[in-house]
Amino acid sequence: VYGGQSINTGAVNSNTVTINGGSVAGGIRGGQSAGGTVTGNTIDLNGGQVAGKAYAGYSNNGTVTGNTINLDGKNGINITGAWLYGSNATATGQNNNTLNIRNFKGRAQNIGNFDRIDLDLAGLTLRAGDPIIVLTEKETTRLGNSTIHIHTGGNAIAHTNSALVPRYEVIKNKTDAGLTAENVKYEKGQITVRQNGALQALYKVEWDGPGIDSVDGDSIDLVKTGETEIVPGTETINESRLALTDFLNAAGDFILDRKLQCSLREDGSIPETCFYGAVSGGDLHHDLNGNKAWAHTTGTHWFIGLRSKLNEKQDTEKDLNGALYIEAGWGNIDTHNRWAKGNGDIHYYGIGAIGERKQKEGNWKSTYLQAHARIGRAFSDYNSRLKDGSGEKLDYDKNSTYYGAGLEIGREWQYHPDYMLDSYLKYRWLHLNGFNTEINGADHKLDDIDSHRTRLGTRLNYTAEKTGMPYIGIAWEHEFDGNARGSVMGYSLKDTSLKGDSGVLELGVKFVPSEKSRWNYDFTIEGYVGQREGVMGNFVVNYLF
């Protein structure tokens, strides 16, 4: 098959032969002249079966320059019986006859006489002892005087399903004839090879021969140049878990910030037992330490509970109250760091208990102490946009147990008949169990997460109207820990955490339809600034039995 041909001294320029399928048995000439120049001719090998000698350019007496063979194995091509040559003359490095190899893994008879070889290995699977291109002719493969270039762009990622090794063979003559690469120039650049989409290392292209003019070498290799490391951005998996932790923290705040108060009876007394329930919706953004990372959560929280007085009515010194509740929530998460983004769905179910003691007389009158504990199960279905060399994304669908506890101490000051100031200090701990999982063939060990927070604040309540009592509050919150740690195939993930300070502003109103109503309502808007930013809206319904 000829792209162009001259049987005398005519020039043969700019012809193209394209093979997309079928069978070619007798060789190919991109351009051929008996005595003229042959320039700018191209052979595109995209599919089918090709045998015989394929010359990008061929001239008996003229110059052969700027001719190209493009070998693309994307659609499958068999060149087991083919020889690929840039020209019929030995390469000098000056004639720009080029072989471009892309998406190809297979066998050929031999290659040679190219001034430039361009390797695009993106997406290919590398294995130790399994060359990308195997040459089977018992004649030395001569790549001398050429320039070998390897694609190094952002998408130039090969992959392997086994441990990264010091060398991978790319072009290998499997016979005793060997492969020579004297005076070869290796253009600067390295390719990333990823193991199971989790670990990676940089590799450069290099001949395996010991020296110039030696025939002891037999391959062009990828040679490891740096240490094995976790793929940057893989910590996105822990960022998603921090998003879940923050969502659970918001749920706890929502429940625990609601005072255990029932609607008053008609005579003004406090009932012993009441039912209460609430719903909250929020949109929160949390900056995570390091790598310009953040986590964003949106969703709703629900709970229903039963509050009861625990001490005798005749006790004039103190009030003891307790509550049991069921909690649940559903939401969405988005995460971002310098290298990767992700999103997912989360939900949880749990139970909890709250106990409160309030002093009714003495020097500590109106001082209260609250303790709580909660436990449940949290579920996360997360998908990141971080890909391995084969295009597989890092994702998981797991669930784990969470539990927590905390203390709150505060005091109410009725410094004016119409105004009451409630100041408090809160400590809250939440624990989210870690888990082990396999993602794209890589073992991930994700450690437990512990959140330790304090909140110092005060709330001003207007108490003149019993049917409508607005309030405003401010608080400072500090997260001491909230670190997410883990490892991938024994290599430690970069730490990321919720640690930091946030400010809280709340505006709300408590109201009852009438003084005789068994219903009590509480509506609050909370705004956050700092490490945690966003808005929460809470609505509580309280019913007297």
Question: What residue ranges belong to the model's regions?
Answer:
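Outer membrane beta-barrel transmembrane domains
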Residues: 352-356, 440-545
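Tandem-repeat/low-complexity and Cys-motif detector
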Residues: 2-12, 29-38, 55-64, 83-93, ...
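Flexible, surface-exposed loop regions and adjacent strand-edge segments
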Residues: 292-296, 339-345, 385-395, 438-446, ...
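Extracellular beta-strand/loop-rich repeat segments of large surface/secreted proteins
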Residues: 63, 73-169
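Outer membrane beta-barrel translocator domains of Type V secretion systems
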Residues: 229-415, 522-531
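Feature marks extracellular polysaccharide-active and adherence modules
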Residues: 2-7, 18-20, 25, 29-34, ...
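Low-complexity acidic/polar repeat-biased segments
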Residues: 185-231
